[in-house]
Design a protein with these regions (language model features):
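Nucleic-acid endonuclease domains
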Residues: 1-28, 45-176
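Short acidic loop-to-beta-strand element that houses the catalytic metal-binding Asp/Glu
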Residues: 27-40
């Protein structure tokens, strides 16, 4: 059986390994902050098959589309995908800027990923350039999803908005 690690343990490992301070207990945009190093970070756990070129499972980046003031199902039905992506970008930017507002010294936001490949683990991270979130756009779309261009380089992963789950998700390509 694969190893299962509770999110709380992952967060604590991150706190201990980088000397940061835990925040939010799951109800905040990031899991840790380091005001001395001026960053906040969110810890994410992903599973991956290990097959070269394959994607990991998904992790949620944002789930509160109702705050956009639009009805996601209607936007999909009317093929208003540019509006869907710009609404999600605005909401994600607002979510992450809350950290910078609450902690004035925070300048950078990171995602740290622990990727489980059976019994092996890989660690990677990415900086989120919050100011460039307004530049993301539609890559392609279907009746139930919108793939996002320019959130992450396509060789490293893909980001998608799922209509049915009403959330924005990220998958990584760990072998790349």
């Amino acid at each position: 059986l694969p190893i299962h690690i509770p999110k709380e343990h992952l967060e604590q490992w991150l706190v201990q390994s980088i000397g940061a301070k835990p925040v939010g207990s799951g109800n905040y945009p990031v899991d840790v902050i380091d005001v001395n190093e001026n960053f906040g970070a969110d810890a994410k756990m992903l599973a991956w098959s290990g097959k070269p070129g394959s994607a990991s499972n998904e992790t949620s980046l944002l789930q509160k589309f109702k705050d956009a003031g639009n009805e996601l199902d209607i936007a999909f039905k009317q093929n208003k995908f540019d509006g869907v992506v710009s609404d999600w970008a605005r909401l994600l930017k607002k979510k992450l800027n809350k950290v910078k507002k609450d902690y004035e010294k925070i300048q950078k936001i990171y995602y740290f990923f622990l990727i489980r490949e059976d019994r092996n683990f890989h660690l990677c991270g990415m900086e989120v350039n919050v100011e460039k979130l307004s530049l993301i756009s539609v890559d392609k779309s279907s009746k139930s999803s919108v793939w996002i261009k320019d959130f992450i380089e396509s060789r490293y992963g893909e980001s998608k908005i799922y209509k049915s789950k009403k959330r924005m998700e990220l998958r990584l390509y760990p072998s790349n």
